């Protein structure tokens, strides 16, 4: 049975959850930091020990988060005005003896300074079903944190799943559309939107087919990006195409669905094939007329890739079935020359100008969300495009970003420490870092926004006894990279 929340049932359930403080803050406050963290690791016993009272919040935590069977009277009191029978008819609960247990995962979700949301998805016990619909997982959170949040007229959540990205889009887009090929995903997304009183258009179909002929200001997608043999074991992760072919086709088609200046962002995986550089592979997918920023965040060898996704699907890699599947998957990788699999974020922006295409390998961990960095990167690309001429760049006034630090390092020498290098780097965002020589470090130190870049270079040429023209030629490419990475900020 597909879940369905009528408007009246959604309103009643929302009232009950709000009254009980079954929210991200309410649950975290009840459980405490240690039990809440343990629950996130899949260790429920600390939460069971804390949420042991008869209060509505305790009952809902045990029922909806911990998988307990709760007595009819306790469930009725916690969910009122929604009755347990109505909740069961909606697909939320199932009778178990004299009590009730959850039939779906219903958990609170929210963002800083945002509304309290709830997300409906499948329970982990259903994970090995082909049409399993995942909840708020690591991939969903990664994409949400990387998405640009500027106000737009229209947004498309391509492959909406349980609706997480569409929920976020509802805060900054006037119209939100979600698509999915799986009826169960669409049903759960519809229930999520009804429960949160969010208006999202849902359309059924594969990839971009349901929105043929339409353009959007923003497209976000957490598509089935796991490269492997051509098969569909799980709709949420397997494309049915060989390797990364489906993703390549999707990326190539995105420009035709973007309005002028529209931005598409998606999580993606690409194969590292023997004898081929991964940027060349992904570059071949990119549509004409789009700026592109491709950020590789992880690289997995074949064994790690296969084992990770077997465990994600609930399959023990050491079981006979797990070994058979791994053998077939690894043999496919051997035949196709796959040496590794990259994972990251791909951002496209439709433009009428000559496109800027940049590939970055950023595997070092950082905590800051990537969304503000993507927004800043797009702005900086516009600025650099407007200052593409050397004369325009030299006339600009630039300021060193406040988070930038200069590092110098030395090595032991015959008479003590000997300077061997220096680097500048931001201490926020992705921690961009560039090695610099003496003149470059001095130039950055002089960037306070008071003088045009050209005058600073002239002063630098005098100080270092170098021809100005030669210093301009050597310096401007680095300056452009400093601007692109946000180390230098245009003034005024």
Locations of regions flagged by a protein language model:
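Mobile active-site "lid"/loop adjacent to the S-adenosyl-L-methionine
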Residues: 183-184, 221-249
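Acidic, low-complexity/disordered tracts enriched in E/D and polar residues
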Residues: 1-59, 98, 126, 353-445, ...
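Flexible, glycine-/basic-rich loop-and-beta segments that form/coincide
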Residues: 302-378
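A short helix-to-beta-strand connector/capping loop
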Residues: 115, 197-200, 290
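Conserved Class I SAM-dependent methyltransferase catalytic core
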Residues: 182, 243-296
């Amino acid at each position: 049975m597909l879940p369905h929340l009528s408007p009246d049932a959604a309103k009643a359930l929302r009232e009950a959850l709000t009254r009980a403080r079954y929210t991200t803050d309410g649950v975290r406050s009840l459980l405490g930091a240690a039990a809440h963290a343990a629950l996130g690791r899949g260790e429920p016993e600390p939460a069971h020990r804390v949420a042991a009272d008869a209060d509505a919040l305790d009952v809902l935590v045990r029922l909806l988060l911990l998988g307990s069977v709760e007595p009819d009277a306790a469930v009725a009191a916690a969910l009122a005005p929604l009755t347990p029978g109505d909740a069961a008819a909606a697909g939320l609960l199932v009778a178990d003896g004299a009590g009730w247990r959850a039939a779906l995962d219903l958990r609170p979700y929210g963002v800083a300074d945002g509304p309290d949301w709830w997300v409906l998805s499948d329970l982990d016990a259903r994970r090995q079903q082909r049409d399993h619909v995942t909840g708020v997982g690591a991939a969903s959170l990664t994409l949400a944190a990387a998405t640009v949040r500027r106000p737009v007229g229209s947004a498309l959540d391509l492959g909406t799943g349980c609706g997480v990205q569409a929920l976020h889009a509802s805060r900054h887009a006037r119209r939100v559309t979600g698509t999915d090929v799986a009826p169960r995903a669409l049903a759960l997304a519809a229930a999520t939107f009804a429960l949160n009183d969010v208006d999202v258009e849902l359309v059924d179909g594969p990839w971009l087919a349901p929105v043929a002929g339409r353009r959007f200001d923003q497209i976000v997608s957490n598509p089935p990006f796991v490269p492997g043999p051509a098969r569909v074991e799980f709709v949420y992760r397997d494309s049915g195409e060989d390797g990364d072919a489906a993703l390549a086709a999707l990326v190539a088609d995105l420009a035709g669905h973007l309005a002028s200046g529209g931005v598409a962002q998606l999580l993606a995986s690409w194969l590292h094939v023997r004898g081929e550089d991964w940027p060349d592979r992904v570059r071949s997918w990119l549509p004409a007329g789009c700026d592109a920023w491709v950020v590789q965040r992880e690289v997995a060898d074949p064994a790690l890739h296969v084992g990770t996704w077997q465990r994600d699907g609930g399959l023990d890699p050491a079981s006979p079935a797990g070994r058979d599947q791994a053998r077939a998957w690894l043999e496919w990788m051997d035949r196709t020359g796959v040496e590794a699999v990259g994972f990251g974020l791909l951002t496209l922006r439709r433009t009428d100008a000559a496109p800027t295409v940049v590939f970055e390998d950023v595997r070092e961990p950082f905590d800051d969300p990537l969304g503000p960095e993507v927004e800043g990167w797009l702005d900086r690309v516009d600025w650099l495009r407007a200052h593409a001429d050397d004369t325009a760049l030299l006339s600009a006034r630039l300021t060193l970003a406040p988070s930038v630090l200069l590092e110098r390092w030395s090595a032991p020498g015959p008479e003590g420490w000997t300077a061997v290098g220096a680097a500048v780097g931001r201490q926020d965002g992705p921690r961009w870092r560039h090695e610099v020589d003496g003149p470059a470090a001095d130039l950055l130190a002089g960037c306070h926004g008071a003088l045009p870049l050209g005058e600073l270079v002239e002063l630098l040429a005098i100080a270092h006894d170098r021809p100005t023209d030669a210093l301009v030629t050597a310096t401007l490419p680095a300056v452009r990279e400093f601007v692109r990475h946000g180390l230098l900020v245009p003034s005024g």
